Design a protein with these regions (language model features):
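Fold-independent oxyanion-binding glycine-rich loops
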Residues: 18-20, 64-67, 97
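Short C-terminal domain-edge/linker segments immediately following a structured domain
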Residues: 45-51, 65, 92-96
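Mid-chain, well-packed structural core segment of small domains
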Residues: 49-75
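Solvent-exposed alpha-helices and their adjacent loops that cap or buttress functional pockets
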Residues: 6-10, 53-56, 84-85
Length: 97
């Protein structure tokens, strides 16, 4: 998986995680194209344990892919019903308020 924290002064960090095979691909659903880019998901390849640790700390989370989403579900942060499918790929966004 690839992971990147987006940091902006005065705003909560955003954690972006995608499954490795999705990086630099484009997903399609109807008229919508979603680019899974290195600029958003980063180029830092991480283990499941590193993703789990990041999920514990993050306030805003963007996950793309079966493995990334499954970690959030296993951690109790999301459910399958919270996901949308982009083609055959699950995607979920989590916001802690």
């Amino acid at each position: 998986m690839f992971l990147k924290f987006h940091r902006s002064p005065g705003l909560p960090d955003v954690l972006a995680v995608c499954d490795a095979e999705l990086l630099n691909t484009t997903l399609k659903k109807g008229d919508v194209n979603v680019q899974i880019s290195e600029s958003f998901y980063g180029n830092l390849r991480v283990t499941e344990e590193e993703v789990k640790e990041a999920l514990r700390k993050a306030e805003n989370i963007n996950l793309m892919g079966e493995r990334a989403v499954a970690l959030a579900i296993a951690a109790g942060l999301a459910s399958r019903a919270d996901c949308i499918m982009i083609g055959t790929v699950p995607h979920v966004q989590i916001y802690r308020l």
